[in-house]
């Protein structure tokens, strides 16, 4: 007799629910929007290899994102802009992006399983699952869509602002990113409420040129 996965069996009582998994990408970076995705998987069309997007190679993530969009019953990707992050704070902006993703589904779920320890305010019944992106396949799928969407967005920002090297660090506070920030100043797509960016502003008008 096959032993059940102790993590996945926690959710076996939800078989009759229409479950969407929800996850975010991009809370830590100094630039660009924060993204969230919601996915309702089709049990009749399983997708092999779903797991936490951070544990997958870029090539594998991109391939799985195509499969998810092709085989899921419904999927939705949403974001909150840098301006919204600075206005609301990153936690509230992340919750808002998650709510937008859930509301963007064309199939209405009866239960949203959220990666992490907090749930967004939404009309859908929600449960937070710590490390859910490695426990629940629908959350894994959402993490992959959110991550690939954000990486694509940062690739576009790299075209617009090539001297920041967004294609290499995706906006995260790496040594290279901080060096380019000091060299070129703060761009319109940087999160001005984040300490490393705020420290560089020091009353100086952000750079607007490419």
Curated annotation (Swiss-Prot):
CDD domains: RNase_HII_bacteria_HII_like. Its EC number is 3.1.26.4. Manganese or magnesium. Binds 1 divalent metal ion per monomer in the absence of substrate. May bind a second metal ion after substrate binding. GO terms for cellular component: cytoplasm; ribonuclease H2 complex. Its cofactor is Mn(2+); Mg(2+). One of its GO terms (biological process) is mismatch repair. Residues 17-206 form the RNase H type-2 domain. It catalyses: Endonucleolytic cleavage to 5'-phosphomonoester. GO terms for molecular function: manganese ion binding; RNA binding; RNA-DNA hybrid ribonuclease activity. Belongs to the RNase HII family. Endonuclease that specifically degrades the RNA of RNA-DNA hybrids. This is Ribonuclease HII. It comes from Janthinobacterium sp. (strain Marseille) (Minibacterium massiliensis). The lineage of its organism: Bacteria, Pseudomonadati, Pseudomonadota, Betaproteobacteria, Burkholderiales.
């Amino acid at each position: 007799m096959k032993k059940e996965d102790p993590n996945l069996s926690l959710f076996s009582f939800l078989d009759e629910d229409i479950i969407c998994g929800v996850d975010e990408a991009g809370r830590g970076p100094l630039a660009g929007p924060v993204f969230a995705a919601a996915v309702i998987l089709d049990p009749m069309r399983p997708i092999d290899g779903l797991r936490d997007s951070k544990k997958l190679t870029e090539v594998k993530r991109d391939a799985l994102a195509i499969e998810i969009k092709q085989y899921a019953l419904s999927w939705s990707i949403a974001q909150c802009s840098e301006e919204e992050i600075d206005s609301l704070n990153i936690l509230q902006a992340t919750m808002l992006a998650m709510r937008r993703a859930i509301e963007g589904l064309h199939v209405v779920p009866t239960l949203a399983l959220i990666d992490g320890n907090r749930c967004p305010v939404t009309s859908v019944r929600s449960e937070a699952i710590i490390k859910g992106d490695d426990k629940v396949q629908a959350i894994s799928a959402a993490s992959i869509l959110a991550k690939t969407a954000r990486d694509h967005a940062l690739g576009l920002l790299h075209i617009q602002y090539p001297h920041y090297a967004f294609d290499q660090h995706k906006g995260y506070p790496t040594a290279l990113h901080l060096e380019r920030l000091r060299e070129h100043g703060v761009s319109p797509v940087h999160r001005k409420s984040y300490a490393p960016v705020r420290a560089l502003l020091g009353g100086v008008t952000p750079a607007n040129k490419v």
